Design a protein with these regions (language model features):
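Cysteine-rich, disulfide-bonded extracellular modules and peptides in secreted proteins
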Residues: 17, 49-53, 92-95, 99
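N-terminal, helix-rich and Lys/Arg-enriched segments in bacterial and organellar proteins
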Residues: 21, 27, 41-46, 60-65, ...
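Short N-terminal "domain-start" leader segments
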Residues: 2-41, 73-81
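Short, mixed-charge low-complexity intrinsically disordered segments
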Residues: 79-99
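A short, charged, amphipathic alpha-helix used as a generic interaction element across diverse proteins
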Residues: 57-83
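Short aromatic-glycine-(Arg/Gly/Cys) micro-motifs in beta-strand/loop hairpins
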Residues: 35-54
């Protein structure tokens, strides 16, 4: 059975940091503008990067980019994440990646 998407109001930054340490992977948040599964929303998805990427089913959504950033800023600050623009080969709905 495929994991259902879990929409949360904000990411739990302590849980993310603890899991990243436990599994020895780098947390990453990818921000999207109106992806296919949320065509009217801005979405932030949580991933863990390493030798293999772990895709989680946890997302934060916002009606605007500003609202989305407001919701994810605590985790960005807590983890000291840095913003990267989308890469040329990325899906057009990807806005940015935080590492």
């Amino acid at each position: 059975m495929k994991n259902m998407t879990v929409i949360v109001n904000c990411f739990d930054y302590t849980a993310i940091a603890q899991k990243a340490h436990r599994i020895n992977k780098l947390p990453s948040i990818v921000c999207y503008e109106r992806p296919a599964d949320f065509p009217k929303k801005f979405v932030a998805r949580l991933f863990y990067l390493g030798n293999e990427t772990i895709t989680t089913n946890v997302v934060v959504t916002g009606d605007t980019y500003e609202e989305l950033l407001e919701k994810i800023n605590p985790v960005l600050d807590y983890l000291g994440m840095v913003r990267f623009n989308r890469a040329p080969g990325d899906d057009n709905c990807i806005m940015e990646v935080w590492l």
